[in-house]
């Protein structure tokens, strides 16, 4: 289901991406292994291979991008979780390669989609579901403001959300709404969320060559 890990030493290949790890002391896999071993953690190799070192019983950290992974102990696919939630991590790019990372994110999207069903167009119900899923209040306000305005209101079937996209599913068609970084006015690829693209485009060149399904799109700007 997921691509194989590149056998090239990630610390060396990070130079290709001009990335300086945030925790240089844990750049080697031996150092990351030791961080787990001294705390008596078993079967830790999958976490250290995914770039993480031990921080606490409830948290591990990526040595490169600094991503915090909570409630990690029973996760079966830490590498996939890492790539999905930290797509610009230099370690992940060096380990899987750009194309491999894109393919992994695409396959993992199906596994990690969250859904909010809109029942009776109830704002309170939807707000509570979004809050339970951990989304910020500004994001929830934006979702609700756009979900319940005419003419879309009567067509909404459900709302699907994940880390990079939120999609309103309508009875007649599908519209994907992509987040835009307002600080530097950069838009990212609708499919992978990694590569920056031009304002009048929706997909990067790599995703176009992979023949991803192209959805009819509308772009909204939101600062979370």
Curated annotation (Swiss-Prot):
Q: Give residue ranges of zinc fingers (C4-type).
A: 189-207
Q: Name one GO cellular component term.
A: virion component
Q: What induces it?
A: Expressed in the late phase of the viral replicative cycle.
Q: How does it assemble?
A: Interacts with subunit p17 of host CASP3.
Q: What is its main location?
A: host cell
Q: Where found?
A: Host cytoplasm; Virion
Know the name of this protein? Inhibitor of apoptosis protein
Which CDD domains did the record assign? BIR (cd00022)
